[in-house]
Amino acid sequence: MQVSRRDAMMLAGAAAAAAGAAPARALSAPGGIAPDDEAGWARIGALYPSMAGPVTQLEHGYWGNMANQVAETHKANVERLNRETSIYARRAMRKDQAVVKARAAQAMGVQPEEIGFCRNAAEGLQALISQFQGVAEGDAILWSDSDYDTSHAAMRSLAKSRRATPVMVNLPRAPTRENVIAAYAAAIKATPRLKFVLLTHGTHKSGMVVPVTEIAALAKAAGAMVLVDCAQSFRMRPFVIPDFGADFAVLNFHKWTGAPVGVAGFWIRPGAAPMVAPAAAEPDAKPEDVQAKVHQGTLDYAPQLTLPAALDFQEQVLPVPMKLARLQWLRNLWVQPLRGLSGLEIMLGDDPATFGAITSFRIAGHTSTADNIAITDTLFNQYRIMTVHRSGLADGACVRVTPGLFTKATDCDRLVAALKDLVPKIARG
């Protein structure tokens, strides 16, 4: 199904008009579809592949659906690459890649020469961490238990290779903006010679949205450079990269941007590129060459070439504030009825500044990785609900729930019913 810009705007406008005609809404989405307008979201959902099936899908944090027209653009790019191979790749593709880069930079709020592409955020994070040149023997680097697992490993490896002091902050068990800032502030104050700080904006474990702008300012005042992982927050929350006041950032385009799997980006503040060594395969790269920090080699170019189509569709049909309001509303549909259920720990509070789509839970006495894999297996096999376990938090493993844009209210109701049945049966202590 092809949707022109005019058709997309008409669709959004018609849905918004319908929302405005309704008597009351749980949340507001000015100029768009109200978060609880199921009919309006169904119309948008018709522009995507059908989600109908025997399993209730509540694990949308891995990657996002492409809209049908984006998938068609991706297919056309795959077919062109397959048909024209090196004639296109060596003679014409570079011009198209420059257009893609400019469009990506525009969405990020930065300049094209400040960004590079990678296949996923983990790849970009590995490069920026392991190749960071601003840490010497006796210096310190800092991260938290909520950061991505492979980033933990990269930070430890950086500390070991440079004989630096590794400092990991355990975030509060019931996180709020205030106590998370306080935890980082205390760690920063207590850490002499701090040179490098990793912050995750939207955590993939609990779902906490960390106030990175405030924390980055504290870290920079202490003399550290700051890397922000916004893989789970880009285009789910309204921001541009410079808002963070950081030196580096990494994000995914295949989560909440709706691009094909296999396209992500990273940003380096102007003037900071020499602080990251080029990839080993790029020994002759200029220090200011951002893309040279990740050597791409030959890869599937179709996802990158499709990125402008995904960004255009999102901006025309799914503005970020409208998207966020929907995801938070869906999250609240399952969280609110389960607050206070004996044996169940909802890991985030209800301040909208601290969550997006993701919120995780624990069942009392089940804190090991094996425990939480078993819970996700039970939810899948017995209740036909898809979730995922997450491990690595200081207080133990958990189960992550991530509604998608076209999750239905009834899907959240099924999870509520399942946990009300399951938790009393297996909670310990």
Task: Identify the residue ranges that each predicted region occupies.
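N-terminal secretory signal peptides and thylakoid transit peptides that target proteins
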Residues: 1-15
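Conserved N-terminal alpha-helix of the aminotransferase class I/II PLP-enzyme fold
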Residues: 84-123, 327
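Structural signature of PLP-dependent enzymes
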Residues: 89, 291-336
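Conserved PLP-anchoring active-site segment centered on the Schiff-base-forming lysine
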Residues: 113-114, 132-152, 371
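Active-site phosphate-binding strand-loop segment of PLP-dependent enzymes
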Residues: 176-231, 235
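Active-site PLP attachment segment
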Residues: 244-286
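Conserved PLP-binding catalytic core of the aspartate aminotransferase-like
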Residues: 325-382
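PLP-dependent enzyme catalytic core of the Aspartate aminotransferase-like
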Residues: 368-369, 377, 381-387, 391-429
